[in-house]
Amino acid sequence: MIGVIRVLIAFFIAVSYAAAAAAQGSGSAQLTVTVTDTSGARVPDAAVILTRSNSEHTATTNADGIAMFQGLLTGPWTVEVVKEGFQTRQRRVAVQSAPTSVSVALEVGGVAERVLVQAAAPAEDALQLDAAATGGTRLDIPVRELPATLTVISQELIQERGINNATDATELAPGVTTFADSGSIPGINVRGFSSTSGAVSILRDGIRQNTVPQSGRPLDTFMLDRIEVLKGPASLMAGEGATGASINYVTKEPRRELQADTLLSYGSWDKYRIGLGVSVPFTSKLAARIDVSHADNGGYVERTSDRLQSVVGGVRWLPTSSLSLKGSLVFTNDRVHPYYGTPLINNEVDERVRFINYNMRDERNEAKNNYGRLDAEMVLPHGWVLSNSLFAATQDVEWREYESVQYIPASGLVQVGSYFLAKRDDLLVGNQIDARKTLTVFSRPIDVVTGYLVQRNDQDRWTGGTIPNQNRLVDPFNPEPIFDPGFPFVFDRNVLVNTHTFFGEGRVGVTERLKFVGGVRWEHFQVDRDQVSTGFASQAYTPTTGRVGAVYMLTPLVSLYTSLSRAVEPTTPLVSITAASMSFSLQPSRQWEGGTKATIFGGRLETTFALFGINKEDILTNTIVDGVRIQQQIGEQMSRGVEWSVTATPTPSFVVMADVTALNAEYVEFNENLGAGVVSRAGNDVPHMPGVVFNITPMQRIGPVSVSATVRKVGERWRDNANLIRLEPYTTVSASASVRFLRGTRLTVTGRNLTDEIYIPRSNSDVSGRIAAPRSFDVQLTRIF
């Protein structure tokens, strides 16, 4: 392992030095920035600063409120507009080979009030359609011109809604629902598929750390710049898995000016958060940033407190005008006292036991996640841009707990069972390199990117070995304390996954309006599993995945698109794969999608619409052959749906954001083994997938005060494959009010589940369920210095 790390580091250094010696290219792209106030009037004499990792350009708007930049590299840039008497405004934009235009609307306020994609800003960028689509492609194109559904959730929007953890923030994307999975690992459902099976992948700054059980641990939103949700089969970006979506958590980066961000929050159940972020420019070429946060939550069920501590540090160095180097380290430590559900008494929620925790008093659920990377971006001669990322991640997790509760009518007692004991020790190292260039063929631009990824994922697992029945019976209303039986950890297995990946993407501008966009990914990953009880087993997989689509620009601000995409997914997440599962092939999934993305009515209305269908094949199903019950990969699952989101600004101070998703997810072919026989579930709905998810948020601004409310509706779901046990639909109401003062300070009061709705978001059991949190409030104070 040490040898592998040394080779990767040597490769990174060699590439960086070679590029530094050769780098001397410049770009030829053009960007036009139009600055207005919220009424649409042009703003002259505004300072416009355009920054990218290795360069900075400045200009001043003319009498028409326009600033122009030429000789730029294509790709993501940050536009910052400063004007006395207005709030300083920042926007991310994707500069393309063709002339690019972007509008920035300023709001009255002090210069020190810096706004990044403010939720109550004009609708022209509320959905960030002009931002670089980094979460959906490696090409330098904006979200508007990506033939797929990509939702960008900004830090500003997260703060406006008072959201503390990253998993909850993903519900700001249309149709996404979340839940607490086994081991209190956050779970996510998208387009009829769940992270439980590995069908939703988590990335950190564009790199997939591991399967969701590792990378999906709790994460404080204070550390993030944004969240990017790419829906549908996303193996092109995330590799195996990602049938339903890939989610990219993007951390904050060092800035070119001295800045400090602070956060203080306190709320129900003695929940508090503290956050401090400082960005320091040592010179014009060297800057560093550190963010520290601590969150503590007492929990709405007794003895279910949790604690999350995070430290993120980063350094950016620009040794030459054509070379950018970045390094970052992330340390997180979360300790959760999990809530595994409330027993249903006579098949109903009995409010007398709603807040009782039946788990053992000394249970343990703790994880330490560390992540580091070194990035280099070099501008080479003839317009080539070379990027390299060397990364490593570690995880240590320990579980000791009971995971089920059940009311026994005959005795009137509650059975506490499913004693679980596990430990993990993971190490992931890898390197990714890619090259980008815009070619000109027959006077038409062709954008290309190609690259190679190599990584090694080494996972050790311990269990409790053979443990006798540890079930306990307790009084449902006054349970006596239960303690850990004290079984030692026993080493169980090592799973080693070596991956080699080649990928490429391209965009061809057939005409000024019509563009074809596509990409392909070829992988070879070798899975070696060495288990104490079953011995050594090995299996290699070589899937090919990708996406191809077309985008037609009706106008520069209205696009139509269609696409086909393909992903693959193992029958069992690789982190927990068994020797028997290794003999099964990967499960392919295919999606067709069509839709539109538009900004109309002078930027007062922004909308996206998508119609999609996904088929996942070769899922495991039970059949009887010659009287013998066996598992075969002949099953199929499908989902069909429509998603619509809109942001409207009828007046400069009033914004309405809404989205609705209608979904039908069902089994086309699936047989379930019930022990006594095999039963077909063909035509049944897939459990836990709501038929409708709806959100609407009106927001009103009165001077420095902003007030908003959100109504969220989640439709009914089935709890089981037989579609016999129904989870009732639920509607929640939340609201927030914030006031800005002292230039850069904001005080926000947030209330959640204001109607005190009693509901179960998800349950795999017909005898218990995790009841959602009751009504709660918190107060948050943020300041930017």
Give short role names for the model-derived ranges.
Residues 129, 152-155, 160, 166-172, ...:
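Periplasmic plug
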Residues 316-320, 426, 444-449, 453-457, ...:
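Structural signature of Gram-negative outer-membrane beta-barrels, strongest in the C-terminal barrel
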Residues 370-395, 417-531, 657:
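Face-selective signature of the C-terminal outer-membrane beta-barrel domain
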Residues 2-8, 13, 17-120:
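Periplasm-facing N-terminal accessory domains of Gram-negative outer-membrane beta-barrel systems
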Residues 199, 211, 222-225, 236-311, ...:
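Outer-membrane beta-barrel translocator/receptor signature
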Residues 513, 613-615, 633-721, 744, ...:
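Gram-negative outer-membrane beta-barrel transporters
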Residues 448, 656, 685-785:
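Conserved C-terminal beta-signal and adjacent last beta-strands/turns
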Residues 375-381, 385-403, 553, 560-561, ...:
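Membrane-embedded beta-barrel scaffold of Gram-negative outer-membrane proteins
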